[in-house]
Amino acid sequence: MPTINQLVRKGRRDKIAKVKTAALKGSPQRRGVCTRVYTTTPKKPNSALRKVARVKLTSQVEVTAYIPGEGHNLQEHSMVLVRGGRVKDLPGVRYKIIRGSLDTQGVKNRKQARSRYGAKKEKS
């Protein structure tokens, strides 16, 4: 417990909020190369095979990123764009791959929320 005099001299130190997407180094997105593409199972109440990729970013950090949407064309050495955003039922997955940019194709036959999955508007 500091004395009044110590507080006058030094003051209190502000708490620093922990950055949730440290690997992006303050950028909205980062480019990276897939080093491994695989499936993993989610936490307890859920059951599925979630598609994830291990990505080496341009910031020299290797992260695990989720591949959203149904079906994908990613394989090892694919160039991808990674954004922040965790997947609640996959521990350690704090990034998502942006569909429809670089080597990642958009989701086929997507009608709603197309911009999130890089799907072009179909001609009617």
Curated annotation (Swiss-Prot):
Gene Ontology CC entries for this record: small ribosomal subunit
GO biological process, alphabetically ordered: translation
Pfam (any one): Ribosom_S12_S23
Keywords recorded for this protein, A-Z: Methylation, Ribonucleoprotein, Ribosomal protein, RNA-binding, rRNA-binding, tRNA-binding
HAMAP family in the cross-refs: Ribosomal_uS12_B
Quaternary state and interactors: Part of the 30S ribosomal subunit. Contacts proteins S8 and S17. May interact with IF1 in the 30S initiation complex.
Protein name: Small ribosomal subunit protein uS12
Lineage, opening ranks: Bacteria, Bacillati, Actinomycetota, Actinomycetes, Mycobacteriales
